[in-house]
C-alpha cells in the first residue's frame, strides 16, 4: 500500500505522520517512511537546492525539473522496491504537490506538469492520499511559530515567504484534486489541536476498506 500526506504550509501533516505510522503498524503494516523532496541520498542534495534561500531567483521551470528529478530517483530506488517487498510506503508529499505548487500556484503549463509527473512516477499513484486542509492564514501562523521555535531566520524560508495569494492557490489546487479523485483522497479538517486532528485522521482511516493487513 502506498499512502501520501499532502497539505499547504503549516497543515500539520509532518506532525501527524508518526501517529499515522503507529496506526498502520497496529493494523499489521510494515512501514517505510519517506518524504519528497529528499527521500534518497541524491534527493537530499536536490532538496538542499530547492529550499536554499540563496536560490530565491530559481525559475519555476527549474524548480519543476528539480522536483521531477528527485521523484524519478525516489520512485525507482526506494518506493517501488519497498512496495515490491510488500511494505507500506508512507510519503510526506508526492506528485500532487508538484501539480498544485508548480502548476496551480506558479502558473506553469498544467499539461507539462502532468507529463513530467507521469514520467517521474512511472505511472505509480498513491492508493490513499491524506489531505490536511485548513485556511492559509491558519497554516502560515503555525508554520511561522514552528520556524521561531526552531530558531530559523525568516529569510531562510523560501515557500513560507510567498505571498498569501500563492498559498491560496495551493489550497484551491489541492481541493480541486480531491474533488476530481474522491476515491483516493481523504480530506481531513486540520484546524485545532494536533490530538483532535489525529482523532479525525484515525476515524477516517478506519472507514477505508482493506486498511487491515492479515
Swiss-Prot record:
Enzyme Commission number(s): 2.7.4.9
Binding positions for ATP per the UniProt entry: 7-14
GO molecular function: ATP binding; dTMP kinase activity
A Pfam family recorded for this sequence: Thymidylate_kin
GO biological process: dTDP biosynthetic process; dTTP biosynthetic process; dUDP biosynthetic process
Catalytic reaction equation(s): dTMP + ATP = dTDP + ADP
SUPFAM superfamilies: P-loop containing nucleoside triphosphate hydrolases (SSF52540)
Family: Belongs to the thymidylate kinase family.
Identification of the protein by name: Thymidylate kinase
Organism: Desulfosudis oleivorans (strain DSM 6200 / JCM 39069 / Hxd3)
Amino acid at each position: 500500500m502506498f499512502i501520501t500526506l499532502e497539505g499547504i504550509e503549516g497543515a500539520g501533516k509532518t506532525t501527524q505522520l508518526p501517529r499515522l505510522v503507529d496506526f498502520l503498524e497496529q493494523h499489521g503494516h510494515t512501514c517505510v517512511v519517506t518524504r519528497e523532496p529528499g527521500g534518497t541520498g541524491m534527493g537530499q542534495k536536490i532538496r538542499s537546492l530547492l529550499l536554499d534561500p540563496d536560490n530565491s531567483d530559481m525559475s519555476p521551470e527549474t524548480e519543476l525539473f528539480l522536483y521531477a528529478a528527485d521523484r524519478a530517483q525516489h520512485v525507482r530506488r526506494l518506493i517501488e522496491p519497498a512496495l515490491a517487498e510488500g511494505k507500506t510506503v508512507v510519503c510526506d508529499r508526492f506528485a500532487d504537490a508538484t501539480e498544485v505548487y508548480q502548476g496551480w500556484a506558479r502558473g506553469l503549463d498544467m499539461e507539462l506538469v502532468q507529463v513530467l509527473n507521469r514520467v517521474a512516477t512511472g505511472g505509480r499513484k498513491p492508493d490513499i492520499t491524506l489531505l490536511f486542509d485548513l485556511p492559509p492564514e491558519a497554516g502560515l501562523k503555525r508554520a511561522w511559530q514552528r520556524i521561531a521555535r526552531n530558531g530559523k531566520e525568516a529569510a531562510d524560508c523560501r515557500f513560507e515567504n510567498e505571498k498569501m495569494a500563492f498559498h491560496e492557490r495551493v489550497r484551491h489546487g489541492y481541493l480541486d484534486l480531491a474533488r476530481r479523485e474522491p476515491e483516493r483522497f481523504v480530506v481531513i479538517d486540520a484546524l485545532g489541536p494536533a490530538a483532535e486532528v489525529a482523532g479525525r485522521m484515525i476515524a477516517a482511516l478506519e472507514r477505508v476498506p482493506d486498511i487491515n493487513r492479515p
